[in-house]
């Protein structure tokens, strides 16, 4: 039993789970932005479309994590139909390490982007013509989530299985 917990296959699946943790950041970020959006829409229902756009921005981290988790599962044969391939501890650890950037950065950047989006939503509440500025503030945080996605993708593709 203990041997199966410390196998390459286990580490690879733990890596896929780690990548999927980016969804936590997205869930919190979208929730924070949603709270701000509800306040603005309660004052002016016509601003719903503008604030919904800003509320959706923190959701991308979860998508990035899901993408890397799927790529891990495809790489190890879990989604290919032939069954999971045997992995060495080094291969499993490499896959786990490759999943860390998108998972960890996704958690923190999703929350930070939610706060930036909430501030942008409040800006739109007072000055609807400033939507682009509010989006830019939130998009600045997105840069780091995209960089983490790129790092995870490149690391994952460098591992030979």
Regions found by a protein language model. Name each.
Residues 1-161:
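Hydrophobic, small-residue-rich transmembrane alpha-helices and their short perimembrane loops
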């Amino acid at each position: 039993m203990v041997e199966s917990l410390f196998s390459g296959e286990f580490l690879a699946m733990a890596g896929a789970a780690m990548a999927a943790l980016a969804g936590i950041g997205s869930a919190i970020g979208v929730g924070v932005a949603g709270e701000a959006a509800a306040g603005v829409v309660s004052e002016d229902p016509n601003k719903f479309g503008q604030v919904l756009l800003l509320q959706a921005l923190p959701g991308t981290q979860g998508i990035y994590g899901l993408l890397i988790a799927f790529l891990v599962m495809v790489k190890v044969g879990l989604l290919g139909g032939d069954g999971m391939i045997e992995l060495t501890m080094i291969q499993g650890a490499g896959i786990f390490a490759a999943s860390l950037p998108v998972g960890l950065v996704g958690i923190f950047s999703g929350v930070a982007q939610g706060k930036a989006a909430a501030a942008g939503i409040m800006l739109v509440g007072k000055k609807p013509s400033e939507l682009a500025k509010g989006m830019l503030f939130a998009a600045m945080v997105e840069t780091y989530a995209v960089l983490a996605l790129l790092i995870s993708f490149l690391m994952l593709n460098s591992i030979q299985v």
